[in-house]
Amino acid sequence: MVLLPLLGPVWGLSAFSGMDATPLLIATLVLSLVGLLDDLRGLPVVLRLVVQGLCAAWVLSSMDVVPQVALGVGAAVWALGLLWLVGFTNVFNFMDGIDGLAASQAAFVGFASAFLSVRAGAGADLPLLLALAGASSAGFLCWNWPPARLFMGDAGSLPLGFMLAALGLACVLRGLLSIWCLLILWAPFLCDAGVTLLLRTLRGAAILRPHREHAYQRLATALGAHRAVTLGVLAVDLCWLLPLALLAEGRPECAPMAALVALVPLLAGVVVLSLRLPADGANVKVGVCTD
């Protein structure tokens, strides 16, 4: 449902602007179908990753990623692009574990990226696509806000995460956003997913097996409420990360430091929550999340 408002406008926009959005649209639909099958019947992890990799390669090839650069540099850009698209698609999916969190973050990043790319002198295509992604996510949030009545599932989170990753990468490749800005805007998701993956790897746990060990899940269980966590992340987005993203884009020489200021406190917070709060509600007396 979260994707339906996007498809027609995106197709029309691609025809109007001359930008070929067909690979992105088809890849998004394929990933939505794969996610639906995984929701209904379960699919092997390897199959899901192969499909995601093929979709990422097709979309990346349509971006003309490495024009007039040396082959070695081109290969590195391709590898990093594939890693970003496939990796972030799964990060977004991992972070869709409590009511409202993924949809609100998608709305924030969509609108913020659209605004920042317009400030950088972008044409109409990418800002409008980003704004559409933000508006679609905000609309879905009306039903997904805690207590949620509708849920993304893999059928929604995989394609939405992929689309946002692809649009963000396109902005970076066009020079509209810096990599630092992208890291700042997605800092809550990247920090939580990265720390959780590292801790599970160090512990010898199966990193591809479903779990509820993310910091945001631990905190929601400890508080007994999804709404408090979702509102807290939104407050961090608007009061902390958005000003840092504006600084990074307005003063490029300050961008690395702005990213550091954004990431380090969040990384520290995620580590503390992950080490001090139990997963799955173990030894927590407040009960299950109710809102």
Predicted features and spans:
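Membrane-interface capping segments at transmembrane-helix boundaries
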Residues: 269-286
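Extended hydrophobic-aromatic, low-complexity segments
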Residues: 176-180, 197, 208-210, 228-231, ...
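Alpha-helical transmembrane segments of integral membrane proteins
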Residues: 213, 223-239, 243, 248
